[in-house]
Amino acid sequence: MPAIEVGRIAVIIAGRRAGQKVVVVDVIDKNFVLVTGAGLNKVKRRRMNVKHLEPLPERVNIERGADDEAVKAALEQAGISLE
């Protein structure tokens, strides 16, 4: 089981957004991933270094590159909050 995968919930541990939860939307390469807060918190869709993320055990079923509406729907269906 890879620690950083599409759909994995993670906490940002570095930078001004530290402490915010995000969802991994795409794995760019071994060092960077695309994350989003899906409009549920102030984290916009952006590229992040995997060293700045701490993965959580929760995961939602989304497709690679899913838009924010699909991520938000998957989070609501799974009963997971990003706040």
Swiss-Prot record:
A molecular-function term among this protein's GO annotations: RNA binding
Cellular component terms (Gene Ontology): cytosolic large ribosomal subunit
Record keyword Ribosomal protein present: yes
Keywords assigned by UniProt, alphabetized: Ribonucleoprotein, Ribosomal protein
InterPro entries the record matches: KOW, Rib_uL2_dom2, Ribosomal_eL14, Ribosomal_eL14_arc, Ribosomal_eL14_KOW, Translation_prot_SH3-like_sf
Pfam short name (any one): KOW
UniProt GO BP: ribosomal large subunit biogenesis; translation
PANTHER family the UniProt entry points to: 60S RIBOSOMAL PROTEIN L14, LARGE RIBOSOMAL SUBUNIT PROTEIN EL14
Classification via HAMAP family: Ribosomal_eL14
Similarity annotation: Belongs to the eukaryotic ribosomal protein eL14 family.
NCBIfam families according to UniProt: PRK04333.1
Entry protein name: Large ribosomal subunit protein eL14
Organism field: Thermococcus onnurineus (strain NA1)
